Amino acid sequence: MEGDSAGGSGKGARNRNTQALLPLKGKILNVLGAASSKLNTNAEINDLCEALGVGMGTKFNLDDLRYDKIIIMTDADVDGAHIAALLMTFFYTQMRPMIDAGHLYLACPPLYRLTQGAKRVYVADDAEKDMWLEKGLGGKGKIDLQRFKGLGEMDAKDLKETTMDPTTRKLIRVTVDEEMPGETGDLVERLMGKKPELRYQYIQENAQFVEELDV
Protein backbone atom coordinates (compact mmCIF):
# COMPACT_ATOMS: atom_id res chain seq x y z
CA MET A 1 0.00 0.00 0.00
CA GLU A 2 1.33 3.40 -0.98
CA GLY A 3 2.31 5.77 1.79
CA ASP A 4 1.59 6.34 5.45
CA SER A 5 -2.15 5.89 4.87
CA ALA A 6 -1.56 2.20 5.57
CA GLY A 7 -1.07 3.12 9.20
CA GLY A 8 -4.44 4.81 9.49
CA SER A 9 -7.52 4.13 7.41
CA GLY A 10 -5.92 1.09 5.79
CA LYS A 11 -5.58 -0.77 9.05
CA GLY A 12 -9.11 0.19 9.99
CA ALA A 13 -10.44 -1.11 6.67
CA ARG A 14 -8.71 -4.47 6.54
CA ASN A 15 -9.86 -7.85 7.80
CA ARG A 16 -7.18 -8.67 10.35
CA ASN A 17 -7.77 -12.40 9.93
CA THR A 18 -7.09 -12.50 6.20
CA GLN A 19 -5.41 -9.25 5.13
CA ALA A 20 -2.00 -7.76 5.87
CA LEU A 21 -0.69 -4.34 4.83
CA LEU A 22 2.84 -3.31 3.93
CA PRO A 23 3.26 0.48 3.66
CA LEU A 24 5.72 1.64 1.00
CA LYS A 25 6.99 5.20 1.34
CA GLY A 26 7.59 6.92 -1.96
CA LYS A 27 8.78 5.31 -5.18
CA ILE A 28 10.72 2.06 -4.89
CA LEU A 29 13.88 1.32 -6.84
CA ASN A 30 13.52 0.77 -10.59
CA VAL A 31 15.12 -2.66 -10.67
CA LEU A 32 15.47 -2.87 -14.44
CA GLY A 33 19.19 -2.66 -15.10
CA ALA A 34 20.03 -2.14 -11.43
CA ALA A 35 23.03 -4.02 -10.05
CA SER A 36 22.28 -7.03 -7.84
CA SER A 37 24.18 -5.37 -5.00
CA LYS A 38 21.81 -2.41 -5.19
CA LEU A 39 18.78 -4.71 -5.08
CA ASN A 40 20.11 -6.66 -2.12
CA THR A 41 20.75 -3.53 -0.05
CA ASN A 42 17.51 -1.70 -0.85
CA ALA A 43 15.42 -1.42 2.33
CA GLU A 44 12.00 -1.31 0.63
CA ILE A 45 12.75 -4.36 -1.52
CA ASN A 46 14.10 -6.30 1.45
CA ASP A 47 10.99 -5.45 3.47
CA LEU A 48 8.80 -6.60 0.59
CA CYS A 49 10.61 -9.92 0.21
CA GLU A 50 10.48 -10.54 3.95
CA ALA A 51 6.76 -9.79 4.10
CA LEU A 52 6.00 -12.14 1.22
CA GLY A 53 8.31 -14.84 2.56
CA VAL A 54 10.21 -15.26 -0.70
CA GLY A 55 13.55 -14.43 -2.29
CA MET A 56 14.36 -12.68 -5.57
CA GLY A 57 15.43 -13.95 -8.96
CA THR A 58 16.90 -17.45 -8.82
CA LYS A 59 16.16 -17.60 -5.08
CA PHE A 60 12.42 -17.16 -5.62
CA ASN A 61 10.33 -20.18 -4.59
CA LEU A 62 6.60 -19.97 -5.25
CA ASP A 63 5.90 -22.54 -2.53
CA ASP A 64 7.20 -20.07 0.08
CA LEU A 65 4.70 -17.35 -0.85
CA ARG A 66 2.67 -16.48 2.25
CA TYR A 67 -0.39 -14.99 0.56
CA ASP A 68 -2.73 -16.03 -2.23
CA LYS A 69 -3.32 -12.51 -3.51
CA ILE A 70 -0.59 -9.88 -3.67
CA ILE A 71 -2.42 -6.61 -4.33
CA ILE A 72 -0.67 -3.40 -5.38
CA MET A 73 -2.69 -0.56 -3.88
CA THR A 74 -1.63 2.96 -4.89
CA ASP A 75 -3.26 6.37 -5.26
CA ALA A 76 -5.55 6.81 -8.27
CA ASP A 77 -3.31 9.45 -9.89
CA VAL A 78 -0.22 9.67 -12.08
CA ASP A 79 2.22 9.24 -9.18
CA GLY A 80 0.29 6.19 -8.00
CA ALA A 81 0.40 4.70 -11.49
CA HIS A 82 4.18 5.25 -11.58
CA ILE A 83 4.64 3.45 -8.27
CA ALA A 84 2.46 0.60 -9.51
CA ALA A 85 4.58 0.38 -12.68
CA LEU A 86 7.78 0.19 -10.62
CA LEU A 87 6.31 -2.58 -8.47
CA MET A 88 5.08 -4.55 -11.49
CA THR A 89 8.53 -4.22 -13.05
CA PHE A 90 10.06 -5.65 -9.87
CA PHE A 91 7.64 -8.57 -9.73
CA TYR A 92 8.01 -9.25 -13.47
CA THR A 93 11.80 -9.34 -13.40
CA GLN A 94 12.39 -10.88 -9.96
CA MET A 95 9.26 -12.95 -9.17
CA ARG A 96 7.82 -13.85 -12.58
CA PRO A 97 6.38 -17.25 -11.46
CA MET A 98 4.12 -15.38 -9.04
CA ILE A 99 2.53 -13.54 -11.98
CA ASP A 100 2.25 -16.70 -14.07
CA ALA A 101 0.47 -18.43 -11.18
CA GLY A 102 -2.11 -15.63 -10.99
CA HIS A 103 -1.16 -14.16 -7.61
CA LEU A 104 -0.51 -10.50 -8.56
CA TYR A 105 -3.31 -7.92 -8.70
CA LEU A 106 -3.87 -4.18 -8.97
CA ALA A 107 -6.40 -2.52 -6.69
CA CYS A 108 -8.80 -0.01 -8.27
CA PRO A 109 -9.37 2.80 -5.76
CA PRO A 110 -11.75 5.56 -6.85
CA LEU A 111 -10.74 9.08 -7.73
CA TYR A 112 -14.06 10.67 -6.74
CA ARG A 113 -16.99 10.14 -4.40
CA LEU A 114 -20.35 11.65 -5.35
CA THR A 115 -23.15 11.94 -2.80
CA GLN A 116 -26.72 13.11 -3.33
CA GLY A 117 -28.96 12.67 -0.33
CA ALA A 118 -28.77 9.01 0.67
CA LYS A 119 -27.27 7.99 -2.69
CA ARG A 120 -23.52 7.55 -3.06
CA VAL A 121 -21.28 6.39 -5.90
CA TYR A 122 -17.53 6.09 -6.36
CA VAL A 123 -15.96 6.73 -9.75
CA ALA A 124 -12.52 6.15 -11.19
CA ASP A 125 -12.14 8.92 -13.75
CA ASP A 126 -13.39 12.29 -14.96
CA ALA A 127 -15.55 10.85 -17.73
CA GLU A 128 -17.59 8.76 -15.31
CA LYS A 129 -17.75 11.68 -12.87
CA ASP A 130 -19.13 13.99 -15.55
CA MET A 131 -21.70 11.39 -16.55
CA TRP A 132 -23.07 11.15 -12.99
CA LEU A 133 -23.03 14.93 -12.56
CA GLU A 134 -25.14 15.27 -15.68
CA LYS A 135 -27.68 12.52 -15.00
CA GLY A 136 -27.79 12.75 -11.19
CA LEU A 137 -27.71 9.99 -8.61
CA GLY A 138 -31.43 9.89 -7.91
CA GLY A 139 -31.17 11.33 -4.42
CA LYS A 140 -32.44 14.58 -2.96
CA GLY A 141 -30.63 17.91 -3.10
CA LYS A 142 -27.45 18.88 -4.89
CA ILE A 143 -24.58 16.52 -5.60
CA ASP A 144 -21.61 16.73 -3.24
CA LEU A 145 -18.34 15.93 -4.99
CA GLN A 146 -15.13 14.90 -3.26
CA ARG A 147 -11.85 14.17 -5.03
CA PHE A 148 -9.53 11.79 -3.23
CA LYS A 149 -5.98 13.08 -3.60
CA GLY A 150 -4.71 9.82 -2.14
CA LEU A 151 -5.63 6.70 -0.23
CA GLY A 152 -4.93 8.55 2.99
CA GLU A 153 -7.83 10.94 2.31
CA MET A 154 -10.34 8.10 2.48
CA ASP A 155 -11.75 7.08 5.81
CA ALA A 156 -11.80 3.40 6.73
CA LYS A 157 -15.38 2.98 5.49
CA ASP A 158 -14.59 4.41 2.03
CA LEU A 159 -11.41 2.39 1.70
CA LYS A 160 -13.03 -0.86 2.79
CA GLU A 161 -16.04 -0.52 0.50
CA THR A 162 -14.12 0.48 -2.62
CA THR A 163 -10.73 -1.17 -2.34
CA MET A 164 -10.41 -3.81 0.38
CA ASP A 165 -13.71 -5.65 0.89
CA PRO A 166 -13.63 -8.77 -1.36
CA THR A 167 -17.40 -8.51 -1.89
CA THR A 168 -17.38 -4.94 -3.25
CA ARG A 169 -13.85 -4.10 -4.46
CA LYS A 170 -12.56 -4.28 -8.02
CA LEU A 171 -9.25 -5.97 -8.82
CA ILE A 172 -7.24 -6.32 -12.02
CA ARG A 173 -5.19 -9.50 -12.30
CA VAL A 174 -1.72 -8.86 -13.73
CA THR A 175 -0.99 -11.34 -16.52
CA VAL A 176 1.52 -11.92 -19.30
CA ASP A 177 0.11 -12.71 -22.74
CA GLU A 178 1.09 -16.35 -23.29
CA GLU A 179 0.98 -15.90 -27.05
CA MET A 180 3.41 -12.96 -26.97
CA PRO A 181 5.64 -13.30 -23.88
CA GLY A 182 8.63 -11.83 -25.69
CA GLU A 183 6.66 -8.74 -26.65
CA THR A 184 5.81 -8.14 -22.98
CA GLY A 185 9.49 -8.24 -22.08
CA ASP A 186 10.34 -5.82 -24.87
CA LEU A 187 7.63 -3.41 -23.71
CA VAL A 188 8.87 -3.50 -20.11
CA GLU A 189 12.38 -2.76 -21.38
CA ARG A 190 11.17 0.15 -23.51
CA LEU A 191 9.12 1.77 -20.77
CA MET A 192 11.22 1.04 -17.70
CA GLY A 193 14.75 0.57 -19.04
CA LYS A 194 17.66 3.00 -19.03
CA LYS A 195 17.25 4.22 -22.60
CA PRO A 196 15.04 7.35 -22.63
CA GLU A 197 15.01 7.37 -26.42
CA LEU A 198 12.97 4.15 -26.39
CA ARG A 199 10.37 5.73 -24.10
CA TYR A 200 10.26 8.81 -26.31
CA GLN A 201 9.74 6.63 -29.37
CA TYR A 202 6.91 4.76 -27.64
CA ILE A 203 5.21 8.03 -26.68
CA GLN A 204 5.51 9.32 -30.24
CA GLU A 205 3.98 6.13 -31.61
CA ASN A 206 1.07 6.07 -29.17
CA ALA A 207 0.30 9.72 -28.38
CA GLN A 208 -2.50 9.72 -30.95
CA PHE A 209 -4.46 7.22 -28.85
CA VAL A 210 -4.49 9.37 -25.69
CA GLU A 211 -7.90 10.91 -25.02
CA GLU A 212 -7.29 12.41 -21.56
CA LEU A 213 -3.97 13.27 -19.93
CA ASP A 214 -3.47 13.90 -16.21
CA VAL A 215 -0.21 15.81 -15.66
Predicted stretch roles:
Residues 1-215:
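Conserved phosphate-chemistry cores used by DNA topoisomerases
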